[in-house]
Amino acid sequence: MDPLKLPKQEFADALGKISSRLGLAEVPEIEKTRRYGYFSARFHKYKIDPTRLRDAVEELSNAGFQYISGLSAEGLYVNADLNAKRLGELVFEAVAKMGKKYGFTEECQLGSFLVEHTSANPIHPLHIGHGRNAILGDSLARLLRFCDNRVEVHFYVDDCGVQVMYATIGYNAVRDEAREWIERAKPDLVVGHIYSATNAVAEIGRLKKEAERAQDDEHKRSLIGEIDEWVAVLKRLMESEGDLVAKVVERLGQRDVAGEAVELNRRYEAGDPEAKRVVREVVDLVLRGQRETLARLGIEIDRWDYESELAVWSGEASRIVEELQRRWPQYVEYKGGAVVFRADKFVDDFKLWDVLDLPKFIPPVTLTRSDGTTLYVTRDVAYALWQARQGFDKVVRVISTEQTHEQAHVRIILYALGFEDVAKKIVHYAYEMVNLPGMKMSARRGRYISLDEILDEAAERSASLVKEKSPEIAGVIAEKVGVGSVRYAFLSTSPRKPIEFRWEVVLNLRQNSGTFLQYTYVRAYSILEKAPDVERASVPEQMLEEEKELLVKIAEWPSVVREAVRALRPDYVAEYLDGLALLFNSYYEKAPVLKAVEGVRKFRIALVNAVKTVLEAGFYILGIPTLTKM
């Protein structure tokens, strides 16, 4: 139910009558932005005299409107306000009937969606950048589910490639020590340390070999400089992680780690049983830790999709390369044994820029290595085909803007293979990076802030905030406040804008934070806890201006949900909830609820209940935990 539906229809009917009186063949649309009233419409393009428009409006002044008031003409604008009493009745009726589903309308039902998010490499803990991905994807799924769409959430496990093999080789070199560490630390954290150390050892070995072959002194000096950088990385890792990293260096220092990784990856992709056993042991350890982190945020995954199973062992990625070579030999080139598809020429020739919503520049794409093994983009095409076959109307892939070209290549290759509908079905839900002031992250160098660290610090800082308010319950609720603050921080900004993560903003108790919203909810809850059951309240003819504003804001909730789900923008919900909370807190300071006279008291209790109902629905969509004390 949408409380604004009847008022909007009544205004539209009035516009129809005005247009008829003026002899116009069409009715102007209602403006999205307000002009001189809640509803406005422009008559500018009809080139009529403003006096005629004013006269036509005045003829309707006694039309007995139920839901709008103050119909007027200002220049060539026709405007109307809302009848606050009738709007209040519509709001209370909708809230009573819909309960926690208030905000849902049939227009929100868009079909079925496969949402893929997070999909982090299984070699280290989720870091702060993965946090934005995971929280965005989870809130998209929640928003779609709130609107009764069928949704399934997937995580793509990228278990192939040299980086996973580095983690596997390192882990098996210090397996006994690693298992001891895992008894007292998260497995993804332990494997992450091992991976960073193994990668550094591999890079040092590779660079040393290259330096030995270098003929040019300047090039040799450059390589030695790079070696020194990686030695510094190892030194820093040993200072922070001690014995475990030292053991990795001791046992791998004289081995050709890079060569071993290539060979292990070849065996794994070929389906060698022993390679599968050792690699999957490490991958599953990391996924166990990543699952724990996601669970902390209230995020659930419906299905874990392994790259090896869906793209490599199935032979799908290889078939894609063969089919492109067969269909489009004129767009295929060979460079040093690698297969390259001229996606740039293909797009130009078939004019696909707008059809596939492509970026302005498209480079050629390499499909295989020189040894014939397929690369990431080819496997991603195989995965996209598998996703499309699962029977969903849309496939939403939450992937950073850094992969804009890779995701464009996926759509182009699908189109080239004859899967035009699949290419159009896939949505690359792009998002920008999270910046931590003063820090540049690199997982390969073991330099990143894990999502667990962010959540730990959020809980710790929240505990100190909460102690000032309720010292006896600080420890119990600090985690929920921390989770709410982090989730809101990642959702309140447009996905296409970078986030600068600052604690003074994330935990702001006065506005625009998850903490502020939770604090507002506790205020509403505490009022209703002391009040008798919410009864069907009558709406007074006269009310405070803040009460009118609150009723209008609550009435707008269904349209906010509708716009958010159509645009796939949870930040619309975050922005709306912040505005609602600001209005409610201002009202809370001015208007007594429980001590008001009987008729007014019932109305205000119903108003507070409506605010609480909307906050609960919004909290579900954003994944913010509800609190009853703070």
Swiss-Prot record:
Pfam families, A to Z: DALR_1, tRNA-synt_1d
Protein name: Arginine--tRNA ligase
Key word Nucleotidyltransferase present: no
Location within or outside the cell: Cytoplasm
Species: Pyrobaculum arsenaticum (strain DSM 13514 / JCM 11321 / PZ6)
Gene: argS
Any GO BP annotation: arginyl-tRNA aminoacylation
Reaction catalyzed: tRNA(Arg) + L-arginine + ATP = L-arginyl-tRNA(Arg) + AMP + diphosphate
SMART domains: DALR_1 (SM00836)
Similarity field: Belongs to the class-I aminoacyl-tRNA synthetase family.
Record-level GO cellular component terms: cytoplasm
